[in-house]
Amino acid sequence: MREFILLGLSSDWGTQVSRFVLFLAMYFVTLVGNVLILLLIRLDSRLHTPMYFFLTVLSLVDLCYSSSIVPQMPVHLLSAQKSIPFYSCLIQLSASLALAASEFLLLGAMAYDCSVAVCYPLHYTVIMHGGLCLGLAAGCLVAGFTNSLVETVITFRLPLCHNVTNHFACETLAVLRLACVDISFNKVVVAISGFLMIMLPFTLVLFSYGRIVAAILHIHSAQGRSKAFGTCGSHLVTVSMCFGTAIFTYLGPQSAYSVDGEKVVALFYAVVTPMLNPLIYSLRNKEVMAALSKVLEKFRYKG
């Protein structure tokens, strides 16, 4: 088999044109938001802390994750030939799996970092030292790419009956539906992978935020408590969207949604979440906005 045919999201021309503009705009926002975060953290020494180290890694993962899927989508929307070469499909599936799993694990590590900062502020720099931060980030990436390697190998070793994929990208469940043999083993592997890469970090997120809430309740200042709850709430919204859509797609009952519904959910966590992460995690952060103002003032002064 030399190529796969991707049916995409819709065959209506008017809808495809509007989606072409929408996806390009969202991808542009994703690129600008994440690159801006990387530049600000690099330029401002006040942001050289464990929290912003993890944000740097998350932004890099988001850039790569979005770039592995989104650029192909506008091209296919306006093209009559919606095909992708076999090895390009393999690389896309492998990369998206690895980066998605790495992102889930990173969100768990970031929640743990936040809980240490709130619960142990005096010992924060001692606990979250450079070696631990590097180890956590590297562990997230290694685990994500190892998981991707396993899933990719067992998926593409299956004999496929045809090459027409009812999806907008090469995605595990969509490719598995092309198999001519029983895929029960693959479904078990996907479920185990989902538990390890999604549910374990999600449990860590819930545990960490539980500790954060408990610590906040001991704050006597109503203003300080409200501010802390607002910050945690913003982070929790992004985490809930990211984990919620993935859990619905990979761990939910197969009868609960149609293939088209699955595509919409996959679109959400592949396109929307990487765009929202820099907005909610960073651009609403006062320290990041202060760094942005400082950089703009420097350019204004030079001008």
Model regions and ranges:
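Transmembrane helical core of 7TM receptor-like proteins
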Residues: 1-303
